Amino acid sequence: MATKYPKFSRDLAQDPTTRRIWYAIATGNDFESHDGMTEENLYQKIFATHFGHVAIIFLWASSLLFHVAWQGNFEQWIKDPLHIRPIAHAIWDPHFGKPAIEAFSQGGANYPVNIAYSGVYHWWYTIGMRTNNDLYQGSVFLLLLAALFLFAGWLHLQPKFRPSLTWFKSAEPRLNHHLAGLFGVSSLAWAGHLIHVAIPESRGVHVGWRNFLTTLPHPAGLTPFWTGNWGVYAQNADTTGHIFGTSQGAGTAILTFLGGFHPQTESLWLTDMAHHHLAIAVIFIIAGHMYRTNFGIGHSIKEMLNAKQFFGIRTEGQFNLPHQGLYDTYNNSLHFQLSIHLAALGTALSLVAQHMYSLPPYAFIAKDYTTQAALYTHHQYIAGFLMIGAFAHAGIFWIRDYDPEQNQGNVLDRVLKHKEAIISHLSWVSLFLGFHTLGIYVHNDVVVAFGTPEKQILIEPVFAQFIQAAHGKLLYGMDTLLSNPDSIAYTAWPNHANVWLPNWLDAINSGTNSLFLTIGPGDFLVHHAIALGLHTTTLICVKGALDARGTKLMPDKKDFGFTFPCDGPGRGGTCQTSSWEQSFYLALFWMLNLLGWVTFYWHWKHLGVWQGNVAQFNENSTYLMGWFRDYLWANSAQLINGYNPYGTNNLSVWAWMFLFGHLVWATGFMFLISWRGYWQELIETLVWAHERTPLANLVRWKDKPVALSIVQGWLVGLAHFTVGYILTYAAFLIASTAGKFG
C-alpha cells in the first residue's frame, strides 16, 4: 500500500479524516516534531535548506536580469532615466483586446508591457551596468551560482558531507567566519566593485572583463596606500556640475566624505558609498578576529556571559543584569536564535525602508516616485512580518527550550518573574496613547464638521522640530547646534574643517527631497497614532511570549504546547489562550493595522511634497474625515475609473486588483466570525449533495470530511485578511502614484 501524505508522521498518515491534510500542512515545517528526528539531523536539514534558499534568491535575481535584458528597455532608459518608464517584462494575455493592447504598450514599447517599480534599473545603472549584454552576463552568472548552491545543498545531505552537531554548536568560529567572511570580506568586495567598476563608469570610463586589470581606479595607483598618504584618495572629488555617466565635471577621488547628494542624480555620492563600505569592511574584519577558536586566543563568549567581574569591578547588582547560563540556553535553542535573528533583521529592514527614500543610494531613483512609494511600503511590510515571527519563535522557545534550573537569576528568569509589570505597563501606555490620540482626532473631526475648524486642538511637535534643527534644518529658526554656525557642532574637531557639512546643510534645507521633512500638528497626531500601533502590537507580542509557559487562568499551559485547540476538557473560556493565538494570530492584525497607518502617512505626506502642495496634508491630516476623504477616497478615483464603459487604461489591472483585494480581505471575515459547528454542518450538506448528484458522485474521496477546528478557521481567515489587505493597498499605492506622475 502506498504511503499516504505526510511521510514525516505515521500517526497523521493513518488519520482517516481530512484532518490528515490540515495537520500535515500545519506541521510540515515543524521538523522537531517529525518521526525519527534527532537533534543532529535537525541541524543538518536546516543547514542544507540554507543553500536552497540562497539558490532561489539567485534564481529570482537572475530572472529579473534576464527578462529586462530580453524584453525591457534598459539601454533606452539610461539615455533619459527621468522621463522614460523602465519596463519589467512583456505581457502576453489572450484576454487583451485592442484597447488593452494600446493602453499597455508603454515605456516606448510597441507591445504590452509591465512597468518596473522595483528600482532595479536604477541599481544596475548605479553599479556600472550599461548594456543588455551586461544584464545577460549577470543573469547567466547568477544562474550558474544558483546551480552551484543547489548542488552544495544536496552535497551537505550526503552522509560523508554532513557536518556534525559539535560543528553546528561552535559559536565562536561561526561568529568569526560570519563577521569577517560574510560581512567583512563581502563589504570589501563591494567597495572594490564600486571603486574599480561603478565609479569609473559614472565618469564615462568603461571597465569590463577585458580591461579591469589594466585600468587604474585612481591615477596615483597604490602608492598613497603603501606610503600612508591616504588623503590623496579623497582629493579632486566630482564637481557639483558632474554629469553622471560622463567625464564632464568628473574628478579622480575614490574615497570621499562629501555628504549630501549628487546634484544631478539626487542620490548619495558613489565615492562616499565606497568609503562607507571600505570602513565597514575594516571594522568587521577586525571584529571577526575577536573570538576564541582552536588557537586559545581571543574572547570566550561563555566566559564573558558568566563573568562576575568587569575590569576588576563586581558586576552583579540590582541593575547589572546577570547573564549566567545564557550561553548554553542560546546555543542549544534554535528558536531562541531564530527569534533574535528575526527581530534584528526586522529592525534592519524597517531602517532600510526609512533610509532608502531619505538618503537614496541609487541614481535618479529619488525622482521615480512610484518606485519610492513601492519600496518603502515593501520593506516596512516585510519588517512587520519578521517582527511577528520573532515573537512567535520566542513563544516556542519558552515552551520547548527554556530550562528554569539552568537560567536561575539571569535576565530571562527576571523578565519572566516580573512579566506582570511589563505587560501592564504596555497595556497602560497603549490605553493612554489610544484614548488621547483618538480623542484629539475625534474632537477635531467634530469641530470641522460643525464649521468651526479654528477650534481644533493643534499641537506643534516642538521636540521633534528641535531635533531637526539640531541636525541643521533652518526653517524653524531654533538656532541650535548644526543650525547655528557658532555652536560646538560646527566648531569642534574634525568639523572645523567643514569636511561634510556644506553638502549636508544644502541637502537638509533643499525642500525638494525627503530629508527631515517639515512637520506640524498633523504629523504630531499621526506620530502618536503610529506609537499606539507600535505599543499595542508589542503588548500582544510580548504577552504571547511571556505568558507562553503559564498564567493564572491556565497554569499548566506549557504542557499543551505552542498551539492547542480552545475549550479543551473542563477548560471553558480558554479560547485565544495559546501562545500561537496571541504572539502570532492576534498580533498580525495589529501589525497590519499599524502598517496601514505608517504607509498612509508616508504616502500622503510625500504626495504633497512631490506635487508641490504640502498644504493639503498639513490642513487635512488633523481630523479623521481629512484622512478618509482627502487621502483614501480622493486617491481611489483613478482605481475606480481604471476600466469603464469607454474602454480601458494602463491602470485597469491595478483597478481589478483593488477590487479583488477587497474581495479576498472580506472573505477573511467569514472565517474569522463563524466557528466550527457552522463549517461542520456546511461540509456535511455539501457532501450529501455531492453524493446524490449524477456524474459528480462518480468522484469519491477516501478521507471522511471533517470541518476546520476553530483555530484552523482563524488561520484561514487571517490568511485571507492579510493577503487581501496587502493586495488592496499595493494596488492603491501604485495606481494612485503612477496615475499622478506617469
UniProtKB/Swiss-Prot annotation:
Ranges that cross the membrane: 46-69, 135-158, 175-199, 273-291, 334-357, 373-399, 421-443, 524-542, 583-604, 651-673, 715-735
Amino acids binding phylloquinone: W679
Keywords associated with the record: 4Fe-4S, Chlorophyll, Chromophore, Electron transport, Iron, Iron-sulfur, Magnesium, Membrane, Metal-binding, Oxidoreductase, Photosynthesis, Photosystem I, Thylakoid, Transmembrane, Transmembrane helix, Transport
Cofactor detail note: PSI electron transfer chain: 5 chlorophyll a, 1 chlorophyll a', 2 phylloquinones and 3 4Fe-4S clusters. PSI core antenna: 90 chlorophyll a, 22 carotenoids, 3 phospholipids and 1 galactolipid. P700 is a chlorophyll a/chlorophyll a' dimer, A0 is one or more chlorophyll a, A1 is one or both phylloquinones and FX is a shared 4Fe-4S iron-sulfur center.
Pfam family name, one: PsaA_PsaB
Bilayer disposition of the protein: Multi-pass membrane protein
GO terms under biological process: photosynthesis
Quaternary structure and partners: The PsaA/B heterodimer binds the P700 chlorophyll special pair and subsequent electron acceptors. PSI consists of a core antenna complex that captures photons, and an electron transfer chain that converts photonic excitation into a charge separation. The cyanobacterial PSI reaction center is composed of one copy each of PsaA,B,C,D,E,F,I,J,K,L,M and X, and forms trimeric complexes.
Family, per entry: Belongs to the PsaA/PsaB family.
Name the record gives this protein: Photosystem I P700 chlorophyll a apoprotein A2 2
Organism name: Nostoc sp. (strain PCC 7120 / SAG 25.82 / UTEX 2576)
